[in-house]
């Protein structure tokens, strides 16, 4: 017989009755019934009820053990009586009568309960992550993650991609987030950087003559935490393709993403539908207008409409809106069907919500009995109300909510209002995954803080119209061959057709204020490669963590990462980041210049 187990704790069934077996695992629960002690023994695979009676010499030993102690039991499988069957467990029709018992590891008092789903607080859970990971939900989430990655690999290979590993130690680059820097001991004053993404390396692979690359790539960014973003590191399905258009990239990755979500869409116990591919494509400008976001949740049926022209009419006397419009502002509205009978408190609550975001409120008109009602209805005459109905599709029984501001802030608040209203009314469908592509991103944006034009997103994107567009168009009108894939309001991936021609790259960076010398200093390796024959290429990088988060229906990405950092980018279990000995700093030629501690009061 094996030293530790003949079966797992999730394996035994009625047909095993009469067998002598050996199991090993953690004590999940103990129940003392006087002459009998019941133990729920747990391993990765499940639970088995074990029974030990007072005649067993090990009874006292087990009685003194705490939950989470690790034991090995040997005993006989017996069928449970009808009244003691537990059909909630796969092993619930049998139990093991313990004959022998060995303590492998006695546990101290545990700081959090593994056998309970009660929230212990994130700080405690992360400090004792190894205990937290013993819980059934966490075990299932991590196995889901493993299975998703295995499925991704299989599907990418079936699509003709080859997996390569790119360097972890590289050069710092001026991408979006801060780099994590690693001092180079043999090169005083110089640093490696952990890659924010394998961006340059995967492009160099295309220049090297490889046609379709992918990897499950670790990425490192020194950025703040969010519910859908873990600080420090994350993993993405990084891929790149040669001699492709944007359509080719979409056609390659859509079956992979769709297949993953179809395969695992029933993970939570409720099978969700997955939008078919080809996925809907929405231009960036349209997304910002209709949804107030470049990450629209298409499960939400509400749509934003621009009604600036209605409030610009001479017969509309609402000066609060007119004054903003005269200064270049816009009016956006959201039609909400069937809420005319809602009490005044519904509208007041939404106004309070908007004020909490720093807005003056949400104006609204309720349509009933052929007329508009509400605080601003008296300023909008019948003809203008008819124009509002036509623009929004509103009918009696509906309400329309208004946001008025400069275009950027108006789009943002309208998008937030769209989500808030749909959430309050429970309009967002929970039974499906809705995918879309956001395309035609602006190549550049105006940086108000620095008073200059800069790249809007990825500086390596090919501008639509190529060199001619860069030389003849207003930079703020140029679109890029850049795209995001979005699911249920979560950005899964950014990608682009790359700028592989040096003359176009020099001009693109010049417009953003970078001299040729700057470009060569930062991206010299890639530029020199492009000057020696580079194919047109493009790719993307869907986030593994975010895909698993959606499939597991978890609101926080840390629920699908084994050992995540907390919101302050600390590893509470391993006590990282930590200080290092002075001699280590000396050999790295570093001196600390720490901020002075703040004086209280």
From Swiss-Prot:
Compartment(s) where it occurs, according to its Swiss-Prot or TrEMBL record: Cytoplasm
Protein name: Aspartate--tRNA(Asp/Asn) ligase
Subunit structure: Homodimer.
Keyword Cytoplasm listed: yes
Coiled-coil features, chain-numbered ranges: none
Annotated spans, Aspartate: 199-202
UniProt cross-references to InterPro entries, sorted A to Z: Aa-tRNA-synt_II, aa-tRNA-synth_II, aa-tRNA-synth_II/BPL/LPL, Asp-tRNA-ligase_1, Asp-tRNA-ligase_1_N, Asp/Asn-tRNA-synth_IIb, AspRS_core, GAD-like_sf
Alphabetical keyword list: Aminoacyl-tRNA synthetase, ATP-binding, Cytoplasm, Ligase, Nucleotide-binding, Protein biosynthesis
Organism: Rhodospirillum centenum (strain ATCC 51521 / SW)
Annotated positions for site Important for tRNA non-discrimination: 33
Keyword Ligase part of the UniProt annotation: yes
GO molecular function, a single term: aspartate-tRNA(Asn) ligase activity
Family: Belongs to the class-II aminoacyl-tRNA synthetase family. Type 1 subfamily.
Positions annotated to bind L-aspartate: 175, 221, 457, 498
GO BP terms, alphabetized: aspartyl-tRNA aminoacylation
EC number of the protein: 6.1.1.23
Gene: aspS
